[in-house]
A protein has these predicted regions:
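Membrane-proximal intracellular helices of multi-pass ion channels
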Residues: 1-459
Length: 459
């Protein structure tokens, strides 16, 4: 009776209380995933005409909506044209965000964007305020469709002589959207099921086109806006400068590390010529930025290659983009904080600007949560599935950072491990901080008192 009364009291308090933007975003992604799951379980979605079981459909719908790319089976051989179309819609919704698509309909209907919608837009685009959010949303829509269209046109023209116009058009559209949204899904299974882009590892047009789409999609919408204004580097915001510097540094370092550890590995880069090694080393660095396309066998990577891949996957792309992971600026803030503390400084600075303590704490919170979740997931997968710890960690980080690369272990995961990967993909796309603040924390209020401080032994 007491439990029932407490529930009724909580329910009455919630009546009439509007949902926060964080809860709206998290709930909307969950609804989209469930709708996608229902569509994928229909017999018409399967290439064989048989109904797909619920768990694999849920796994695939979550992977598509959360723009990850992990899947228990080959996309082309499992899904019909209808099923692939459902996946494409889920990828677009998940990559651009449901608010972008909703805003498109608002613009088409010539309706006004209300305050609540602006708040949700700002949260979805990782903005600190609502100023200029509608204009930025227009830029996101126009820029995204334009870039995807250019990528689709290039790929269609390139594939046309080899596959015919209709198939080339579908390949161009699907892979352009998948690459730009950093999803990693491919429909090249008619060439070799489950091979991803390995059949194109000697094709610079395909790899460089998809790589460019991945990089642009992972920069973030705020960065696009500043780049479109053609400002000099010094006049750009600190955020944009950090994103550009971090992206360039991560791409170059990932390229160098991949070539270093895989150069003589005959199962990956070792059997290629100089040009092939450099091309595939660069594409591996790009795809680790949460893209999920594989031009080399990820399961054949050396232990050093897998360890480096885990680190780069964990960092991910930039905030307000189609990519996942810790985010580039979060990683940079952590490095700047470490550098400041090692020098005995109490403030964190970048480009002669001080970073607020709250944002430093947010970065530390996200990083700590991601690392702990990654290691817990690896241990859980090892305990429930016949997978080595390195491959389990690779799989857990790939899901949590919405990368989509796999060392060949996705198909051998147990049911509990698959459920964990589904949760990790969802957490990775919505954001650990968004979920914690939206659902786990109570109403934000001023602290009425603090306990007395105490000193501990640290280090």
């Amino acid at each position: 009776m007491r439990l029932r009364n407490r529930f009724l009291l909580w329910y009455r308090k919630r009546q009439g209380r509007p949902m926060s933007p964080m809860k709206i975003i998290a709930s909307a992604f969950a609804i989209i995933i469930l709708l996608g799951t229902v569509l994928l379980t229909l017999p018409v979605a399967s290439r064989t005409g048989e109904r797909c079981p619920f768990l694999p459909a849920l796994f695939t719908a979550t992977s598509a909506t959360c723009v990850t790319g992990l899947t228990p089976f080959d996309t082309y051989t499992q899904w019909s044209g209808f099923g692939q179309g459902v996946l494409l819609c889920l990828i677009e919704l998940g990559g651009l965000g449901f608010m972008s698509v909703a805003t498109l309909f608002v613009f088409l209907l010539r309706r006004r964007v209300g305050l609540k919608q602006r708040m949700v837009m700002a949260q979805a685009l990782s903005l600190n305020d609502m100023e200029g959010v509608v204009r930025l949303q227009r830029t996101v829509l126009v820029g995204s469709f334009s870039i995807e269209g250019i990528g689709a046109a290039i790929l269609t023209v390139y594939f046309w002589p080899r596959f015919g116009f209709s198939r080339a058009l579908w390949l161009g559209v699907f892979h352009s959207v998948s690459a730009f949204c950093n999803a990693g899904f491919d429909v090249f299974g008619f060439l070799e099921p489950g091979a991803s882009l390995i059949t194109f590892q000697d094709d610079p047009v395909v790899l460089l086109t998809l790589g460019a789409l991945v990089i642009v999609g992972g920069l973030g919408f705020l960065v696009w806006e500043e780049l479109a204004e053609r400002k000099p580097f010094r006049r750009m915001t600190v955020y944009t400068r950090l994103v550009l510097c971090a992206t360039a540094a991560l791409l170059l370092s990932g390229w160098a590390v991949t070539c270093l550890v895989e150069w003589n590995n005959p199962a990956t880069l070792g059997s290629m010529g100089l040009g092939g090694k450099l091309l595939n080393g660069f594409f591996q660095s790009v795809t680790l930025r949460t893209a999920g396309f594989a031009a080399i066998d990820q399961g054949a990577l050396t232990d050093g290659g897998k360890a480096a891949s885990v680190l780069f996957m964990l960092v991910g792309g930039s905030s307000g983009s189609t990519a996942g992971g810790l985010k580039t600026v979060t990683f940079v803030v952590l490095l700047l904080f470490l550098w400041a503390r090692l020098r005995g400084k109490s403030t964190v600075c970048a480009f002669r600007r001080t970073i607020p303590d709250k944002q430093v704490l947010d970065a530390m919170t996200i990083a700590t949560a991601m690392v702990l979740l990654a290691f817990f997931g690896a241990v859980f997968i090892c305990a429930t599935s016949p997978v080595s710890f390195v491959n389990a960690l690779f799989e857990a980080v790939s899901a949590l950072a919405t990368v989509g690369l796999t060392a060949g272990t996705t198909g051998s995961l147990s049911v509990p491990a698959q459920c964990l990967i589904i949760l990790y993909m969802y957490f990775g796309r919505v954001g650990v901080l968004t979920i914690s603040l939206g659902f786990l924390s109570g109403e934000q209020a001023m602290e009425r008192f603090r306990y007395a401080q105490t000193n501990l032994l640290i280090g």
